[in-house]
Amino acid sequence: METSSGTPELKVISTPTYGGHYVKYVVAGTDFEVTARYKPPLRPIGRGAYGIVCSLFDTVTGEEVAVKKIGNAFDNRIDAKRTLREIKLLRHMDHENVVAITDIIRPPTRENFNDVYIVYELMDTDLHQIIRSNQALTEDHCQYFLYQILRGLKYIHSANVLHRDLKPTNLLVNANCDLKIADFGLARTLSETDFMTEYVVTRWYRAPELLLNCSAYTAAIDIWSVGCIFMELLNRSALFPGRDYVHQLRLITELIGTPEDRDLGFLRSDNARRYIKHLPRQSPIPLTQKFRGINRSALDLVEKMLVFDPAKRITVEAALAHPYLASLHDINDEPASVSPFEFDFEEPSISEEHIKDLIWREALDCSLGPDDMVQ
């Protein structure tokens, strides 16, 4: 399969620092300082509010890697905590369909620790790029992508973690069609209570219970997102491209129907119940009627994912066992997490300096010292 992220190598300025143990590159006007373990070719492969991502060659493993720089990582407590959460989560996890952190590059001195450099496995592209490209997608491609998403999600959920932000850009793919789930900055454990206070999860893939501000939600929110993503793969366009909350709910009810009273047991808020009851009554449209030409078994699985009542939504284990995935499903090759993940740093009083210290310790724990590096 072709990939769509072949970014050309840039000519970048590089300067050895700290006696050659570190190298500072200037990438699109941004300083990018890494240990000498990481060598060119350097390619910028992503940029966002957090900072910049570049690919480099890891002289220890002999493989290309993705290095994400989070600039001024401790200026904002919420952002810093998000970084700490992703580091701890991904270092806890060990699964073929979850992207791995291979290193956290510690700075030369603790005093200089303002930017965080996280090293990940390098993938070629993501599902968003593939969906938007002219790349032909066969039924087998879509089926294999779905299987891998669910296989990774089974592991994540078994670790007592909800991803909460599954969307095509967070599903990384390589040329062999291997898929890995990424971006755990919004993830939560089931025991955490401040579920929706910090960030807004991408609207198009958001389950009804999130749109209705239900705080007691479950792993079913991720299953809803998978249903939306899989239909987008099959149909090459977003299933529910809502402009705002109201439009999002309208698009959902126009397709799957207005829920009955018996399907609203998960709503604790009288206002949310009243809102749903005042929506225009809609009957569900069978997916086989709306999406003619798409595999009926695939649509049957999607219909079981896109159920308004989260308690009636299919679980990840049941989805893996659905007839549509029979050719790929092997319960003996779909591992669960050995132990649940616990994130113990949610106290409102935790300071930026405390978070910095915790990330520093993570860097010490997983990176080689400069004297141990390949020069």
Swiss-Prot record:
Q: In which tissues is it expressed?
A: Expressed strongly in the apical cells of caulonemal air filaments and rhizoids in fully developed plants and less strongly, but readily detectable in filamentous protonemal tissue at the edge of the plant consisting of both chloronema and caulonema. When filamentous growth of protonema is promoted, the expression is strongest in newly formed apical tip cells of protonemal tissue.
A GO CC term?
A: cytoplasm
* This enzyme's EC code(s): 2.7.11.24
Q: Tell me the ranges covered by the Protein kinase domain, including all copies.
A: 39-325
Residues annotated as binding ATP are 45-53, 68
List of residues that carry Phosphotyrosine:
199
Chain ranges passing through the membrane: none
On this chain, the residues bearing Phosphothreonine are 197
PROSITE patterns per the record?
MAPK, PROTEIN_KINASE_ATP, PROTEIN_KINASE_DOM, PROTEIN_KINASE_ST
- Active site: which residues? 165
Q: Report the family membership.
A: Belongs to the protein kinase superfamily. CMGC Ser/Thr protein kinase family. MAP kinase subfamily.
Q: What does this protein do?
A: The CERK1, MEKK1a/b, MKK1a/b/c and MPK4a/b proteins are involved in pathogen defense. The pathway induces rapid growth inhibition, cell wall depositions and accumulation of defense-related transcripts. This protein is required for innate immunity triggered by pathogen-associated molecular patterns (PAMPs). Involved in resistance to necrotrophic fungi B.cinerea and A.brassicicola. Involved in the transduction of signals from chitosan perception to the activation of defense genes.
Protein name, please? Mitogen-activated protein kinase 4a
Organism of derivation? Physcomitrium patens
